[in-house]
């Protein structure tokens, strides 16, 4: 089985920035990967298209996926509002790692983050389910609009997304 690839076309205040593609590790975390894949295609009638990265901390990560409230308090999975941590096989080994944001154990919804550094203190707490395949330079460009408290200086959105 080949792991799926999805893409995000990123915009800054409505202006195109570029494309980021992700390999989703369906071979290790099938349920978590399928959630992200389906939210990227929008095939369930809801998903990431048009949503923003509400929290960007340079040298740490870019967080998005709250397509219901757009501020980090919302979002939902394809399995219902929340789903359990699938496993912690994969680790936060460095830049480009794609992992689930949560509010504690077994609270996965749709929020995710892209690491821009090694974040080993998150191992065993957040489910890693993918990695940047192409476009890490776009993620690095997104970082420039972040701040230490995570507030972004411009609106960073997923203008389009889907499966390749």
UniProtKB/Swiss-Prot annotation:
One of its GO terms (cellular component) is nucleus. It catalyses: [protein]-peptidylproline (omega=180) = [protein]-peptidylproline (omega=0). It comes from Bos taurus (Bovine). InterPro entries: Cyclophilin-like_dom_sf, Cyclophilin-type_PPIase, Cyclophilin-type_PPIase_CS, Cyclophilin-type_PPIase_dom. It is an enzyme of class 5 (isomerase). This is Peptidyl-prolyl cis-trans isomerase A. Signal peptide: none annotated. One of its GO terms (molecular function) is cyclosporin A binding. The modification N-acetylvaline is found at residue 2. Interacts with protein phosphatase PPP3CA/calcineurin A. Interacts with isoform 2 of BSG/CD147. Interacts with FOXO1; the interaction promotes FOXO1 dephosphorylation, nuclear accumulation and transcriptional activity. Interacts with integrin ITGA2B:ITGB3; the interaction is ROS and peptidyl-prolyl cis-trans isomerase (PPIase) activity-dependent and is increased in the presence of thrombin. Interacts with MAP3K5. Belongs to the cyclophilin-type PPIase family. PPIase A subfamily. PROSITE patterns: CSA_PPIASE_1, CSA_PPIASE_2. GO terms for biological process: activation of protein kinase B activity; apoptotic process; cell adhesion molecule production; cellular response to oxidative stress; endothelial cell activation; leukocyte chemotaxis; negative regulation of oxidative stress-induced intrinsic apoptotic signaling pathway; negative regulation of protein K48-linked ubiquitination. The modification N-acetylmethionine is found at residue 1. The keyword Glycosyltransferase does not apply. The modification Phosphothreonine is found at residue 93. Its EC number is 5.2.1.8. Residues 7-163 form the PPIase cyclophilin-type domain. Disulfide bonds join 62-161. It comes from the Eukaryota.
């Amino acid at each position: 089985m080949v792991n799926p690839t999805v893409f995000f076309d990123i915009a800054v205040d409505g202006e195109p920035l570029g494309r980021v593609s992700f390999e989703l590790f369906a071979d290790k975390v099938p349920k978590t990967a399928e959630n992200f894949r389906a939210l990227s295609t929008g095939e369930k009638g809801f998903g990431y298209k048009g949503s923003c990265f509400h929290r960007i901390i340079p040298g740490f990560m870019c967080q998005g996926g709250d397509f219901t409230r757009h501020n980090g308090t919302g979002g939902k999975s394809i399995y219902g509002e929340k789903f359990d941590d699938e496993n912690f096989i994969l680790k936060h080994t460095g830049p480009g790692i794609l992992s689930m944001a949560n509010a504690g154990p077994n609270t996965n919804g749709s929020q995710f983050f892209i690491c821009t550094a090694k974040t080993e203190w998150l191992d065993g707490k957040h489910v890693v389910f993918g990695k940047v395949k192409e476009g890490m330079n776009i993620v690095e460009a997104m970082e420039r609009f972040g701040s230490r408290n995570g507030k972004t200086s411009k609106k960073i959105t997923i203008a389009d997304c889907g499966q390749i």
